[in-house]
Every structure is written in C-alpha cells, then in structure tokens.
Amino acid sequence: MDLNNSNNQNSNPDKEFIQAAYTTVMFLIDHFNCVKDELKIDYESFIILQVVNSHWLYYKKKDEKITWGETWKKIGANDAEKTLQKKKLSILAISHILKLPQETCRRKIQSLLKKKILRKTTESGIVMGENFVDFHQKYSAKFAHSVSKFILSLSELDKKFFENLLKIKI
C-alpha cells in the first residue's frame, strides 16, 4: 500500500495525514499535561497506577460487567483485595511489564504507598489504596471526556487514514 499516491486527490485519506497527526500529537500533549497538572505526579508513576488498575480490571471483567459508578464504589470498598487474592501484583511484575528498573519502580510505588493511593497486602500484592478513588476519579472523568472529544473530532477522512495505517505490514 502506498500512502503517498492516489488517483483522487480530493478524497484521499492519506492527504489528511497532517491533520490526523496534529490532532493525535495534541491529544498526547494534553494528556501528559493533564496528568502533571491534575494528579501532580510524574508520568511513570501514572503509568504504574494504570498497571495496577488494569490488573484489577482484567480479573474483574472475567467475573462481572460493571458500570462507571459501580467501578468506583467497588474500588472504594477494597474489591481489588478480594478479587486479586492469589493473583498478586508485585513490584517485580510491574517493573517487568513497564521495562523500568526495579529500584525506580520500587521508589515510585513507595511514594504512592505513602500517599495511600496504593496499598500493599500479603494476600493480594499491590492494589488500590484508600485514597485512590479521591485521587483518580476526577482525572479519569476528564480523561474519558478528552478521549471522547479526540475520537469525535476525527473527520471521516482522518478515520480512513488510520484505517489505512492498519493495513500497512510492520
């Protein structure tokens, strides 16, 4: 597939690369700044939180379907501790998943533990802490809004451009 040539210049989604690229890059910059401004943590710590969150979500979705509101209630009620028994998430596992040095990962997790955003238990490993919901819920709503806005801002040609990208063999 040639992303540079097309017979019909007016409807060529590949000609929309510049707009699709700009929209995507601005979304990423906005996301980075939102993490920094809203959560006041570094991006690696944010991604560590996402690993902990995804670990719980992965096992939770196997058991039940829950709404946005139910998710926060379950997190607030320490559901992760019950759900993740015998499915522990460790510092070593997070370090391996993110390809971060183990000591860096340990220090960042220690900081999140101190703020009670995360909690470490012998039965369930690293899970969401008592301050996780207050810390993360407002940001998550803004992020969901931002993702929705990003997706809806894409024109049909932008979407075609991304569809074409998926056809390229990497």
Task: Give the residues covered by each predicted segment.
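Intrinsically disordered, acidic Ser/Thr/Pro-rich low-complexity regulatory segments
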Residues: 36-38, 44-49, 62, 66-70, ...
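Amphipathic alpha-helical interface surfaces
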Residues: 44, 87-90, 105-108
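Short helix->loop/beta-hairpin flanking segments within DNA-binding domains
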Residues: 47-87
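Short, cationic-aromatic polyanion-contact patches
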Residues: 73-76, 90, 117, 122-146
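Short amphipathic alpha-helical interaction segments
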Residues: 99-114
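Short, amphipathic alpha-helical interaction segments positioned at domain boundaries
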Residues: 134-167
